[in-house]
Amino acid sequence: MSITVNQIVLHQLVKQAAEDGNVQLNTVLRNDLLQISAEVEQLMLELHQAYQGKAKGYGVFKEESLFARQLNRLLEQETDFLPFSYEAAKLLATELGKYTFAESGTLVLCQYNFLATDYLFIALLDSRISMLVDENLEIQRTQYLNINQFDIAARINLTDLRLNAQSNRYLTFIKGRVGRKVGDFFMDFLGADEGLNPQVQNQCLLQAVSDYCEQGELNKAQTQAVKKQVFDYCKGQINSGDEIALAELSEELPTLNERSFAAFAHERDYGLEESIPPLRSTLKSLTKFSGSGKGVTISFDAELINQRIIWDEAADSLTIHGLPANLRDQLRRNLTHEN
């Protein structure tokens, strides 16, 4: 897979304590764009691939978005990429300084093309210190960009924005490990509202699959087989970094009552997008039962119900026949002497 970098620049954000005790991020701006080289394209390819594998939120620009106005000027060639990057860096520094997770870092702004799609990528990368051995076999300190682990990043699908103004997914951002606050920051920085909700889309997909099997009058074993087909397809999409294509998924499934899954989903109006970002945590319920509470965590394959695992609804209990060997060994080691 090849990537074409059109324009790229790096700036620095430096964290300092302000006189009022709050955090302040100062910008150190580069005077010119980076020259496109094999190293630059390799950097962006690795950032693109790392971004693809991260959990993302989706948004759309508000009408009053300052960032969107600056971006539109760039796309209409009313300004160049370098001055656009200056405005973006200052805006990001101002907004990020309002949050406790703000840190210094290298700001990457890049306009690139991947698989016939144009993107604008924005990320704040931190630097790590490591050691190297020089040509004289001496140990030296060195700094490197941490391009595999980053939380502050957003990407705009410029092709989608240009061709489909009503899209609810052209703007994405990493949700990050610090929860909702990262989403709040990006909404403020980009001047955006929430767009596509992947959680809702995945839940609606699960409901559509269950209803499809029910209207097809499948028995439990047949239903579980269809759900496993769905999960296997979705797992493959996750592993390859791709989204769930509704039409493609439909081709993997049997036709029931002379209707394909795609036709059934459209007729019932589940509100499913043609392409859905997969969420492993939600999709695993296709083939597993799991739950936790009151000090107990249980997870098992759905096909084991009424075989090795018996559910008694009236007694509110599960009976497990054939414990996992490692659990049985722990019980013997730790509890036998107590009896």
Curated annotation (Swiss-Prot):
InterPro entries the UniProt entry points to: Nucleoid_associated_NdpA
Disulfide cross-links: none
Keyword Cytoplasm found: yes
Keyword list, A-Z: Cytoplasm
Main location: cytoplasm
Record-level Gene Ontology MF annotations: double-stranded DNA binding; single-stranded RNA binding
Cellular localisation: Cytoplasm, Nucleoid
One Gene Ontology term, aspect cellular component: cytoplasm
Pfam family membership, one: NA37
NCBIfam families: PRK00378.1 (NF001557)
Family according to the record: Belongs to the YejK family.
Protein's name in the database: Nucleoid-associated protein Asuc_0779
